[in-house]
Amino acid sequence: MTLVGLFEARDKIMTILKNRPSALSKDEFMHQFAGVYEHSDWVAELLWDQIQVSIESECFDTVDAISAQMKGIVDTANYDLKLALLRAHPDLAGKAALAGELTDDSTSEQAGVGLDQLSEDEFQRFQHINDSYKAKFEFPFIMAVKGATKIQIFDGFESRIDNTVDAEFNRAVNEVHKIAGFRLADK
């Protein structure tokens, strides 16, 4: 790695969020981070608690640190909390999107890959696959769609529908972490 590369890597690692999380009030913190994990404020609440008891609270002021801590909170949560986290996610190109009921983040993510501009046939295909997936796994198909194409999303559905429930549960949690990472990077 070159010296320039080392400085770039250091700068990335040391990226300070717009408002230092360790210096925010609880209300400010929740406003900024509650939506990182879709409709799962408990993740940000637990992170806030960790920051408050930390001797070195400024260690939580980088994107990488916040991301790692939030991921750790989710990974150590019990099964029921993780299942609720998965079920908090909307269907891709689903009825909530049509009704305008998505969070701003989900709306932006789905629109960014054209899921708001599907043909009637594509929409029906998404509905069928969403329904089949939920019938088998009891949570919605979750994929970090940023940068993906509709074809890649359809392929993701098709390649994952044959997974075991345990394998797909773990895959879905990992996709949620990717989504959270994208959301944090945008802060």
What are the roles of these predicted feature ranges?
Residues 42-43, 145:
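Conserved phosphate/anionic-ligand binding catalytic regions in large, soluble enzymes, centered on
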Residues 25, 77-78, 164:
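Residues that cap or delimit alpha-helices
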Residues 40, 47, 141:
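Residue-level signal for inorganic ion chemistry
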Residues 3-35:
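Charged, compositionally biased N-terminal leader segments and the immediate start
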Residues 118-187:
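C-terminal non-catalytic interaction appendages of large macromolecular assemblies
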Residues 6, 43-129, 179-187:
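Aromatic-anchored, charged helix-turn/loop surface patch used as a conserved interaction hotspot
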